[in-house]
Amino acid sequence: MEVKKLKECCTIIAGQSPESKYYNSNGDGLPFFQGKADFGELYPSIRVYCSQPTKIAEKDDILLSVRAPVGPTNLAPCKVCIGRGLTAIRPSEVLLTRYVLLFFRYFEAQLASKGTGTTFKAITQDVVKNLEIPIPPLPEQERIVARIEELFSQLDAGVETLKKTKAQLAVYRQAVLKEAFEGRLTIHVPVNLPLSWESSDETNTLPAIPEEWHYIALKYLGDLGRGKSKHRPRNDPKLFVDGKYPFIQTGDVKAATNCITSFTKQYGEFGLSQSKLWPKGTLCITIAANIAETAFLGIDACFPDSIVGFTPNESILAEYVRYFVESQKIRLWAFAPATAQKNINLDTLENLIVPYCSIDEQRVVISEIESRLSVCDSIEQTVDTALQQAEAMRQSILKGAFEGKL
C-alpha cells in the first residue's frame, strides 16, 4: 500500500487568529473557530463570527486541533475562519475526507504525544505536514469507511443503552432517598425536641412525614461554617510555599465517593494563616459551581468559602444529613441565582428544613438507604466500566481498520 506524507496529498492551512476587534456574535462575516472548545462529535457549534478573516477553511475541510489539546478533529460545517489553535486539512482527489478524518482519530493519541511546550502542548506545522498516511485505492477507502461506521453504529447503540441505564439509576437513587426521608422505610419512634429548637411551621410545600417526626432547620442540628481563603489572588504561589496542609476544592468533594483523602494542592504556613484547618470527619457541602456535593474529610484540611463545613451535635448523625442534602440537590439548585457560576449562600443551608427523627431511627434510615444504594452503586460501576470498554473498543476498531485487519 502506498504511503505518503500529508503535505504530498492534502492542502494544509495553518490557522491564524485575527484581531479581536473583528470578532462578533451577530453573524457578521464568517463563523470563527479558535480551537477545540467548540467541537462537537462531528461538527463544531458556531458561537463567534469574524468580519475580517485571515485564514479560511472550506466546507468539510478537516479541522485539526494543534494546541491544548493536540489531536481532536471535526469537519468545517461551512466556509469558516480558523484561529491559531486549528489547522485545516483538505484531502486531494486520491483521498476520501471521511477516510482521512477516521485516520486522524485513529492516530490522535500518537499525534498528541508529539506535542511540545511547558504551559500547554502544541505541534508545529512541520509535524502535520510530515505525518505519513496510508493511501489504498478509493474503493478500498470506501470499504474501510463503511465498515468502521457500521461497527461504530453498533457500538453507539450499546453506549446509548448504557447511558439510559445510568440515567435510570440516578432516578432510582433519588426515589430511594425520597422514600427514606418521608419515613416510608422505617418503623417510627416518637422524639421530643429540645426547648431551644423551633419546629418549622413552613411545611405546606413539603412532603408529609410521620406524625412522630418533626421538620427542623439544619442550623439547630449542628454547626455550619464557610471555608476561608481570604488572600487574593487565590492562586498566589506564596500560599503554597512549603505546602503541608491539604487544600480541598469543590472538585475534590465531587470526585470523592464518601471520604476525601486525595488533593492536588497544599497550603504552607502563610496559606494556613489566611484560612482555617478543619478536622478530619467534617462533612463538606459545596455551595458554588458544584452545588450540594457532599463528602467527609478523611484528613485535616483547609477549604475555600465555596465549601461549607458541618459538624453535627449529639442529636443528629452526619451521614443522615449527608444523604438528606443529596436528596435536596434539585431544590438547592433552584435557590441559586441565574449567574455564570451557580452558587447558594450559607443562610440557604442553615434554613434548609430537615425531616428529623430519633437517633435510633436515623441509624435505621441510613441502613435502609445504604442497603438499596449499594446495589445501585454496584450496577453503576459495571455500567461505567462498560462505557470505558466501549471507548477502548472504538480505538480497537480504528486500529484494526488502519492495520488492514477489518
Predicted regions and their residues:
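Hydrophobic pocket-lining residues within nucleotide cofactor-binding pockets
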Residues: D38, V128, F181, L185, ...
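A short beta-sheet element
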Residues: Q34-K36, P44-E108, A122-T124, Q249-T250, ...
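Non-catalytic DNA-recognition/assembly elements of restriction-modification systems
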Residues: M1-Q16, N130, P134-V145, S200-K230, ...
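Sequence-specific dsDNA recognition surfaces
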Residues: K7-Y22, G29-K59, D201-N204, K219-K238, ...
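Alpha-helical structural signal
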Residues: D60, T97-V100, K129, I148, ...
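Short amphipathic coiled-coil heptad-repeat segments
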Residues: E150-L206, Q381-L406
